[in-house]
């Protein structure tokens, strides 16, 4: 429900995919759909893509198509002209439910540097755990009022983002100009995979 409310703040219609498994009951699916619609979702549909591939996602695709056809205006939570810290704090409070945002000296220094270099109007791309609305993967549910640590702030000038790093998270490395997967292949007749070493 919290995710539906968060996406709604951005002015976007929400479609909830209910991953249906053989042990589920229709009553469980109905309860999930009712809660999703009550929270503001455009629709909530059963998906069996894990079992049926594309065919199992047809209803989901149709719902997404309908939702994307509705009039809506996507928006940021903040104007780009406000300070980097103000943008971080709006996201921390309005999206994650944080109380106080706590910056390390390194994060403060980076924010000042990027602002001085003219990147202060970039949008924010928060790097945090996917396992919690907080910075801490062990904190479940919808926490409120916690301290939200920003330990590092990076500049992604080419992509056009300021990236605050929160909690203990590793960011994805970039790929080389010739990623290893380019040399991988599967022989469709024998099933033999090549190029893994």
Residue ranges and their predicted role:
Residues 1-31, 35-197:
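P-loop NTP-binding site
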């Amino acid at each position: 429900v919290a995710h539906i409310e968060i996406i709604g703040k951005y002015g976007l219609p929400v479609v909830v995919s209910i991953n249906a498994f053989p042990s589920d009951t229709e009553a469980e699916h109905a309860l999930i759909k009712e809660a999703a619609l009550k929270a503001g979702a455009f629709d909530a549909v059963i998906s069996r893509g894990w079992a049926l591939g594309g065919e199992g996602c047809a209803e989901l695709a149709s719902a997404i198509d309908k939702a994307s056809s509705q009039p809506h205006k996507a928006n940021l939570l903040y104007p780009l002209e406000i300070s980097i810290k103000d943008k971080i704090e709006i996201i921390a409070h309005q999206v994650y439910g944080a109380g106080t945002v706590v910056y390390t000296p390194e994060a403060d220094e980076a924010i000042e540097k990027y602002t001085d270099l003219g990147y202060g109007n970039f949008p924010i791309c928060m790097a945090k755990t996917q396992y919690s609305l907080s910075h801490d993967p062990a904190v479940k549910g919808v926490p409120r009022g916690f301290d939200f640590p920003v330990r590092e702030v990076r500049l992604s000038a080419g992509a056009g983002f300021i990236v605050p790093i929160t909690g203990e998270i590793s960011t994805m490395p970039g790929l080389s100009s010739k990623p290893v997967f380019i040399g991988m292949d599967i022989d469709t007749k024998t099933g033999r995979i090549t190029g893994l070493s």
